[in-house]
Amino acid sequence: MPSALPAPTLITVHPNEVRAIRYKLKQTQADFAVMIGVSVATLQSWEDGRRRPDGPAEALLRIADKNPKTVLKILGRA
């Protein structure tokens, strides 16, 4: 019988990390929101800790944190 896959590790992006990633990319809230495809209100709620990014948004933020220049280039902002 095949072994079960381990449960995925829940990794969440802290509100301070969202803001730090945006600063690293040198983007305003408005520009960053457009760049990642969310509303400014959503981005503000992430940065204020009222909500947390999940799914693709969280993955994009993690990638942007590790490779900001690549993300800017891919998203046409470099």
Model-flagged regions — what are they?
Residues 1-13, 69-78:
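N-terminal flexible/basic segments that precede or flank functional cores
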Residues 14-17, 56:
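N-terminal positioning helix adjacent to the helix-turn-helix/winged-helix DNA-binding module
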Residues 18-31:
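Short basic helix-loop element that most often maps to the first helix and adjoining turn
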Residues 23, 37, 48:
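Residue-level detection of the helix-turn-helix DNA-binding "recognition helix"
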Residues 32-33, 43-46:
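Conserved hydrophobic/aromatic packing and binding residues within compact polymer-binding modules
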Residues 50-62:
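Short, basic-rich loop-to-helix N-cap that marks the start of a DNA-contacting helix
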Residues 63-69:
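Basic, Lys/Arg-enriched C-terminal extension of HTH/homeodomain DNA-binding domains
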